[in-house]
Design a protein with these regions (language model features):
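Conserved catalytic core of the tyrosine transesterase superfamily
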Residues: 1-243
Length: 243
């Protein structure tokens, strides 16, 4: 669709967003446009009530989390702002506010903020490679920081792309990871972990002294990463899980 193509070109040329960020915007918008088509809605003439009904469908029919819904709305608003500026028309989606769901919405990162954070770790250094994997695993798998630092190398199955996790109440569960996570994991195991593992630890994530990385150590890593960004939010493992 021309409007979507023009918008993604704008994000690349004018906003200088990465391909990863642009793809996420595109997926959100295309999902919304598919919904419009299924419900016989002209996206250029969508009413405020129709926009609200779309949000309700995300919650009640697709059972999406509040953070996922919030970011989709943010992506679609950006799309309509672009259309408004270029077509000189007003669209009802501008007026849409996220319905309150009882609990306060967890804090999360926008796509461009995630992109900025992932650019910080230096992949030429063992600690930078490790930090990149920490970001990726918290973001892509949604595991808790306590679960992250408890992973042992033998808990990982690269063939099935799964990790055996010991969660709350010492209950074992399986977490799946994607190709991007697998690539970062392979890089860490091949290029970085051996250089950090001076104490012959079984744990996946190690500190600079060769010992097991702690939850506080992960928080310190995130704090240091944020010092090199223009983002004003306080980054926590919990925030990455909800992004």
């Amino acid at each position: 669709m021309k409007d979507v193509k023009d918008f993604t070109t704008y994000l690349k040329v004018e906003k200088n967003y990465s391909n990863y960020t642009i793809k996420n915007y595109q997926l959100d918008i295309e999902s919304f446009l598919d919904d419009c088509k299924e419900n016989n809605i002209d996206y250029l003439k969508i009413t405020y009530q129709e926009a609200r009904s779309y949000v309700n469908r995300l919650y009640n029919e697709k059972h999406e989390k509040a953070t996922s819904v919030s970011r989709k709305i943010s992506s679609i608003r950006s799309f309509y702002r672009y259309l408004a500026n270029n077509k000189k028309e007003n669209y009802s989606f501008h007026l849409l506010k996220l319905p309150k769901k009882g609990k306060r919405l967890p804090k999360y990162l926008e796509y461009n903020e995630i992109d900025e954070i992932f650019d910080i770790p230096n992949l030429e250094e063992p600690l930078g490679i490790r930090n990149s994997l920490i970001l990726e695993m918290l973001y892509a798998t949604g595991m808790r920081v306590g679960e992250l630092v408890s992973i042992k190398v033998n808990d990982i199955n690269m063939n099935t792309k799964t990790i055996k996790i010991l969660g709350k109440g010492n209950k074992e569960r399986i977490v799946y990871f994607n190709k991007i996570t697998a690539k970062r994991l392979k890089l860490y195991l091949k290029e970085a972990r051996g250089k950090l593992n001076t104490k012959k630890s079984d744990y996946l994530f190690l500190n600079k002294l060769g010992g097991r990385l702690t939850p506080r150590g992960v928080e310190y890593v995130l704090d240091e990463i944020m010092k090199h960004t223009a983002i004003t939010k306080h980054l926590t493992p919990h925030m990455l899980r909800h992004s």
